[in-house]
């Protein structure tokens, strides 16, 4: 009897061991299926793109007057404040123009005074002392001198404005970049001398595939991972472009964004620009034009929650497509 129970116990132990192995295998397979499904959904179904660019408002600064650059007061990539002097253009010439215009105004002021006095005197004498034609000529001369004075005053105002425009100032806070002028060079009116990347104007342009736009709405939150970084930043969808250029048509794009396909012989989903506002400005960390990966997470996201190692790994894999 003892041997029977011992054999039965051993058989039950073997059965339990086999069942444990099967259960463990099933759990592992189930976990693998769940993980694969999450990776597949995260990688293919969620609205995301690795083709996103940090972008900023850029002001092309060009002088409103022509002349020699007498002083360049900034260096390339320097941070400047609104109103700071960037460069100065040949002021002596424009000082002379103002002086000449002031002299013309003074001359015509004296001429108007003289013509007004003469016209008044002839009007008081009347036709008893001279002909009506002489009286009319005096009145016309006064009117002509008055118009000449007004014209001279306008010329003076323009000369003063041009003198003021010889000092080119920063229109906003930002970084001076692509500076390609030096003191002593002659610069033409309207020719761009430097670009100013406006501070606190950075945003993200994410080029989303049209097949994923259904999950993109104004106000949705976005997770942003700069290329080569494990840091995640956050933003909000501001808008989706209302149209892009039709690359299949030869018609004029009429100002619409032109987004080229990667491979012309494969039917690819059209990419549409999506503008994303950043929660905080990062112009000092990621210059305009640098790349990031963007995931649209929906209406809410916990900014304080750190991503899991799996999520960080998936972000890294997305950088490689």
UniProtKB/Swiss-Prot annotation:
Coiled coil: none annotated. The keyword Transmembrane helix applies. SUPFAM superfamilies: HlyD-like secretion proteins. GO terms for cellular component: plasma membrane. It is found in: Cell inner membrane. Pfam families: CusB_dom_1, HlyD_D23. Keywords: Cell inner membrane, Cell membrane, Membrane, Transmembrane, Transmembrane helix, Transport. Belongs to the membrane fusion protein (MFP) (TC 8.A.1) family. HAMAP family: AaeA (MF_01544). Forms an efflux pump with AaeB. NCBIfam families: PRK10559.1, RND_mfp. This is p-hydroxybenzoic acid efflux pump subunit AaeA. The lineage of its organism: Bacteria, Pseudomonadati, Pseudomonadota, Gammaproteobacteria, Enterobacterales.
